[in-house]
Amino acid sequence: RSSWLRVVGRLAPGTTYQMAAADLQSLSDALTYPERGDTEGILVTRDLLYRPSQTAQLTSLSKMLVAVVTIVLVIAAANFAVLLLSRATTRTREMSIRAAMGAGRARLIRQLLAESVLLGLAGCAVGVGLAYTLSDAAATLLPYGFATGFAPDLRVLAVALVLSVVTSAVAGLVPSLHAAGANVAGAISHRRTATGGSLVRDALVVSQMALSLVLVAGAVLFARSFWAARTQDLGFRADHRLILQVDLRSQGYTEAEGRAFLPGALTRLRNLPGVSRVATSRQIPFQGDWSTDLEPPPGALPNSEDGKIWIGLNAVSAEYFETMGVELVSGRSFDSGDIEGGTQVAVVNQRLAHILWPGEDPLGRSVSFGEDLGFQVVGVARDATYYALGEDPTTQMYVSVQQRYQPLVHFVIETAGPPADLAPVAQAALRQLDAELAFGWVATMDDVVADVTARYKVSAVLVGLFGGLALLLAVAGLYGVVSFLVARRTRDIGVRMALGAGRGRVAGEVLRGSLGLAATGAALGLVGAVMLRRFTASLLYQVEATDPWALIGASATLLAVAAAASFVPALRATRVDPVEAIRTE
């Protein structure tokens, strides 16, 4: 089912969707003429923003975004737990004294959990404020140029509140149990007691590193995917091309009037300053299709399930191939001699030539379908992308618009400068021929391609932003842990330095410990990234989900940032004064 016009309406007060749909159905019935096989009508739907293909892409994007946000939430929770665990270690003596004075373990745990939840609620308030502030900017990342309600509503606030409470409570549970279960005598006498806190802390740091590597690797993959989509050889030139669409039939032009209008329009556009070439075409890449099928001639290779040959069509003017930058492999383009009533000629692409006449020269051959008398092939054009990125090689036949008039016209203008700057001038030039001329849409070919690749750009930007945030959280957690351990081990470091340990050896031990955690996390993250390949493969374009360069680059980035984050605590450890450290202890 196809459509040529979409109308968006707002219901009047007191009018239900069912009432409006019934009225529109009556109007639809009045527009149908079954006696002549006319099936035009009105389709009423609430799904008014996006086409089905766009809805599917946005659904995939939404699922990916939910997964990415969930990973960031887990990293943030682990980071929060690490900080609380370090804080709980420093409060062990306080909790032990309170326990000695009669405070029950359950009461201590409740207090610590309450503190965790309050911190989580404070973070929730900051996050909600940022969400309101950045909602407009986030909406601009959506593809297809539609504005969707992005401002948080009460449902979003409720979910954020619940997640904050639950996450902060879960993250604070282990630190609370650790602090409330400290050895009373040892803590009061300042003796260091062996606990499992360090193991839990290390596990949390490793998990952050692993999850952040998954996101960083994903960011690299999506960035490469977007680059591949934007730099793919489409078989035509998109830069410096301006497109103006006009539907002459909907504006009351007869075929004779339309034929008379086009030459003058092309002349006016050619004479504009900054215009290099001008042509017309019925179809523009990525903007719908016009097709037919035919019975395969002897020796042909059918390309459809019903045994026929499916052919994409386009009616173009002379200079179309030069204007769009489509290379002619052999033969010629259309010229002024290809007139109405003359020998019907066509240019086929390489794929169609191979299907119709495998291994033979297509020039001079004839293509016939329906009631047409046949088209003589005068040229072969290079294959191009017509309908979707990554499509299988598609058949295409070009006919001369002078011989096969089409009222739907796309003026293709090659410009010397920025094409968008020429748009108002070109529209004004055409309105000198018809003051009431309406344009279906006006866009640069670069904009058309950008819309097609928007899903890959959005994926790259979002995963890149969240990957960077995840890496920042993980590295901050590692920095906090290393700094905490250096501070806790000040006496040990001082004693070792007093016994002759060099500063380089001390710094090396600190760096080895932190990089060991980072390397373990990176290894686990690589395993996770490989395991998730079947979920990410469908979202990538011409990039393998296990691309080794992406995984190596993500791992190197993680280790480099981890080393940088550990450098300051390691340097601080080398500046410990042995005498002062022992005296303070």
Language-model features, listed with the residues they occupy:
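C-terminal transmembrane helical bundles of large multi-pass transporters
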Residues: 390, 429, 433-526, 537-541, ...
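Hydrophobic alpha-helical transmembrane segments of multi-pass inner-membrane transport and secretion
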Residues: 58-93, 170, 198-223, 456-491, ...
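Intracellular coupling helices
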Residues: 78-120, 181-192, 476-517, 572-583
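Small-residue-rich transmembrane alpha-helices
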Residues: 43, 81, 116-184, 224, ...
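Residue-level signature of transmembrane alpha-helical entry/exit and packing/kink sites
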Residues: 62-66, 107, 112, 152, ...
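Alpha-helical transmembrane segments of integral membrane proteins
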Residues: 47-55, 83-110, 114, 134-253, ...
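Mid-to-C-terminal secondary-structure elements
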Residues: 1-63, 136, 218, 222, ...
